[in-house]
Amino acid sequence: MNITSEELLKEARALEPQLQQWRRTLHRHPEVGFDLPHTKELVKKALTEMGYEPKDCGKAGVIALAGGKKPGKTILLRADMDALPIPEDSGEEFSSEVPGKMHGCGHDMHTAMLLGAAKLLKAHEDELEGTVKLEFQPAEEIFQGSPDMIAGGLLEDPHVDAAVMFHVLAGMPLPVGTVLVPGGGITMASCEQYHIVVKGKGGHGSTPENCIDPITAAAHIHIALQEINSRELKPGDFGVLTTGRFEAGAASNVIPDVAQMWGTIRTTDPENKTGELIRTRMTEIAQGVAAAYRCTAEVSFADYCPCMVVDKPLAENAMDYMTELLGKGAMDMTALTGGKPGGGSEDFAFVSHKVPTVSMFIAAGGPEQGCCYGQHHPKVRFDDSILYEGSAAFGWFALRWLYDNAGIAF
């Protein structure tokens, strides 16, 4: 391999103006779920101009191939593209121009980083000892994009042997650009959506005796569900049950017929037995409490996303490669987490259950940079000075891993 880590980092830094332009254009025009026409257009146009032949994958994904001129393995590099359905209040000069939508998780950063990596890899395509598959994924926030692209053939033609993703972190008191590398095993929780519909009998607020109040029942259900963690799970078992949305009625003087709540269940049990227990008890508790208040309760679950599983040998590769590229800018994530999985979830986990995978994080600004809020907050900011490091990290990982797996001494 003729390129060194220092040279690749220098080439990536030269891309900063373009990286920032891509990121800020995407940030101004956020799109959510699978409905990403403008985002896809930007990605495909940029890839085509670099010399790639981008292809659609699944409902709204884009893939492209680099290398393939030499026999060897295939490594997948992934960036998610979708935004969140929340209003932006960051104060950035390039804030969202779309009411009620915002890139509040940094997926605009990821997309720009992978486009930068695509440019670097195209420039060094003759040095790739195998193939790099670039994945631009929709619908991560609803945990549907990854399984959809897998069903669309993401991991085949050519078959993927390893997979890599990076996620930016905002609001963390870490040096900007620090890459956090996990130690292997389960690193992120599973997640599942739940929906509870409590049905009663509506009427005038002045005559509750003639009604069956679903709000009272739903409120008691919500409180009772919080006892599952403390009374039903073994000490040490990780389980988080959160109700994030509660709706009932439309007028202050009317008892409604229906009250509803939506939320999530998160566990770190790879076999999901903890999740099964929580689901069973949720249903029993909701229906039992509802009956005590003369109501009925319907409980449903959807959009299950498994735990993220990081391949230990690949994580060891990652630590070596990121140290080569960034020196002390690479950090063992277990120093922060104690080796315990995080409670967040990521739908790239579907890939991690099929091929060896590593998911890393990049510190994208903390309080010193004015990035005082974390992901999914309307005021969150990301320091896009780290974009070139993300591009270089993607590119260097691919180059080095293909070399290592071609049996060539570095």
Indicate residue ranges for each PLM-predicted region:
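Electropositive phosphate-/nucleotide-binding environments in soluble metabolic enzymes
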Residues: N2, E6-L9, R13-Q20, G33, ...
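Non-cysteine beta-strand/loop elements that form the S-adenosyl-L-methionine
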Residues: L76-R78, P87, Y194-I196, S359-A364
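Histidine/acidic-residue-rich, glycine-tolerant segments that coordinate divalent metal ions
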Residues: L84, G91-M102, M109, L121-P256, ...
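Histidine-centered active-site/metal-ligand motif
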Residues: H27-H29, H103, H107-H110, H167, ...
